[in-house]
């Protein structure tokens, strides 16, 4: 199974999660700015990762997903966000953003870099769902 993780990160949290997922799946973590060069049709699984700021994900990630929505819809796809919220508030935010992207499998992570270093169990659970 070939996996690509396309992410948008500003403080490194989303990038850390993307790289962790790539290391566990044998996949490739690619910043959205470089993802335009990738042919998504050559991957079995497409994971989209974004950071949340002011209730939304970066515009370039939204544009990327919209431009590739037909290919993403044909793939095993998943979405994650790194956000400041925990619990129900974080889940609701993630649910809303995943619905906007039309991706059913999704998860949210708080403090991605710290999570990867100290307790990646939640990320491992997300990976298992792929």
Q: Model-derived features: where do they sit?
A:
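FMN-binding flavodoxin-like domain, especially the glycine-rich phosphate-binding loop
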Residues: 3, 9, 13-16, 22-28, ...
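A short glycine-rich beta-strand->turn/loop micro-motif centered on a GG-aromatic cluster
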Residues: 29-36
């Amino acid at each position: 199974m070939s996996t690509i993780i396309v992410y948008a990160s500003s403080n490194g949290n989303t990038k850390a999660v993307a790289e962790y997922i790539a290391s566990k799946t044998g996949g490739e973590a690619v910043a959205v700015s470089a993802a335009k060069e990738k042919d998504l049709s050559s991957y079995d699984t497409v994971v989209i990762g974004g950071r949340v700021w002011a209730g939304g994900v970066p515009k370039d990630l939204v544009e990327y997903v919209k431009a590739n929505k037909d290919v993403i819809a044909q793939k095993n796809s998943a979405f994650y966000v790194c956000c400041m919220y925990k619990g129900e508030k974080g889940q609701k935010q993630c649910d809303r953003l995943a619905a906007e992207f039309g991706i059913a499998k999704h998860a949210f992570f708080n403090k991605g870099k710290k999570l990867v270093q100290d307790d990646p169990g939640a990320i491992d659970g997300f990976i298992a769902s792929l």
